[in-house]
């Protein structure tokens, strides 16, 4: 299965599902991975790569290591290995690995080719597609980075067989995000489908990539419709920052963030209580958290202004309109948001 992502005036790329065979290059290749993923899949990947020289760059595992210090370490190894502008970086791992490998590729000698091979469900349905790269800092999540498209993305469902249940569920949160905002039919299907079934899983990834591809093609740099893919993330990024990226996986924080956004949508009359309950039930069915004890509602609210989606001192909220549609709102009164946050205190 293949989905083509196309852009006006410049080359696009393919997202391949269960089609990873041999990769042939006429240049040096650096594979960025971590010890856990490398131990499982690195030898398998190396056997499929035909190139003059291969280098392995291992990065620490975890969102707390997604920072400029790790980027510096990656760049240093690229220089020591004497890679150049003809070289290729391959990201083998989840969203953290692809974010960092892509960012390093975008700034190494002003940009070299990179390929994503995502090994988590979250990365396959969302993070590896679309060219967002970057790292965190003390002010918030993904505040340093670039839009830099990969040359190809290879999603292999076989890589997901070793995922822990919690990691798998975190990926399903991003799929729920797309269903709630774009596709009511997908939402209803997810309510009843056995998503551990290989065929169902492949179909889920395919549909999510279709949704993401359409948004990216229409709005590569997130000025309009692509911002909808941040549904739940405005709240989630604050939660992750408040908990030092250690308590929740990204998808878990997004799950809580979607429930918070849904509560706000109900107050604005965009969503019924019954629809909010349906969304919450699906998240809980997948073993995802939907509640968070907000330490201080005022501080939480102020943290929104560090979000990349804030524009001209206005917070941009991505909110569901029922199930299967969305609204982007920049006019939500502070007190209405505070009411939601106080409900979670």
Please place each PLM-identified region on the residue numbering.
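A glycine/threonine-rich phosphate-anchoring loop and its flanking beta-alpha core
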Residues: 8, 103-193
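Glycine-rich beta-strand-to-loop/alpha-helix junction loops that act as flexible
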Residues: 61, 92-94, 231-232
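Active-site nucleophile and cofactor-binding loops and adjacent substrate-binding regions
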Residues: 92-94, 118, 249-252
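Short glycine/serine/threonine-rich phosphate/pyrophosphate-binding segments
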Residues: 96-102, 124-125, 238
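C-terminal charged capping/lid subdomain of soluble metabolic enzymes
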Residues: 173, 270-345
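Active-site segments that bind and position negatively charged phosphate/pyrophosphate groups
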Residues: 188-298
């Amino acid at each position: 299965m293949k989905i083509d992502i196309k852009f006006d005036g410049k080359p696009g790329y393919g997202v391949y599902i269960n089609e990873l065979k041999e990769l042939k290059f006429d240049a040096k290749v650096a594979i960025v991975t971590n010890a856990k993923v490398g131990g499982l899949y690195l030898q398998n990947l190396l056997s499929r790569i035909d190139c003059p020289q291969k280098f392995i760059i291992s990065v620490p595992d975890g969102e707390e290591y997604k920072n400029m210090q790790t980027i510096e370490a990656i760049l240093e190894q690229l220089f020591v290995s004497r890679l150049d502008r003809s070289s290729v970086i391959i990201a083998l791992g989840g969203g953290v690995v692809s974010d960092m490998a892509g960012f390093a590729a975008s700034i190494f000698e002003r940009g070299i080719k990179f390929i994503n091979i995502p090994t988590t469900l979250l990365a396959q349905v969302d993070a590896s597609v679309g060219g967002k790269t970057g790292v965190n800092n003390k002010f918030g999540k993904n505040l340093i980075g670039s839009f830099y498209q990969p040359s190809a993305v290879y999603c292999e469902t076989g890589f997901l067989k070793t995922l822990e249940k919690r990691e798998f569920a975190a990926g399903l949160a991003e799929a729920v995000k797309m269903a709630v905002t774009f596709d009511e039919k997908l939402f209803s299907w997810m309510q009843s489908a056995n998503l551990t079934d290989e065929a169902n899983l492949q179909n889920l990834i395919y549909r999510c990539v279709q949704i993401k591809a359409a948004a990216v093609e229409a709005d590569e740099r997130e000025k309009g419709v692509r911002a909808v893919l941040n549904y739940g993330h405005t709240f989630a990024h604050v939660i992750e920052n408040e908990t030092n990226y250690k308590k929740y996986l990204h998808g878990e924080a997004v799950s809580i963030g979607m429930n918070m956004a849904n509560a706000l949508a109900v107050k604005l009359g965009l969503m019924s209580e019954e629809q909010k309950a349906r969304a919450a039930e699906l998240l809980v069915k997948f073993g995802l958290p939907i509640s968070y004890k907000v330490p201080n509602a005022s501080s939480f609210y102020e943290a929104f202004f560090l979000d990349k989606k804030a524009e001209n001192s206005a917070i941009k909220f991505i909110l569901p309109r029922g199930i299967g549609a969305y609204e982007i709102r920049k006019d939500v009164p502070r007190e209405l948001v505070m009411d939601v946050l106080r409900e979670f205190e």
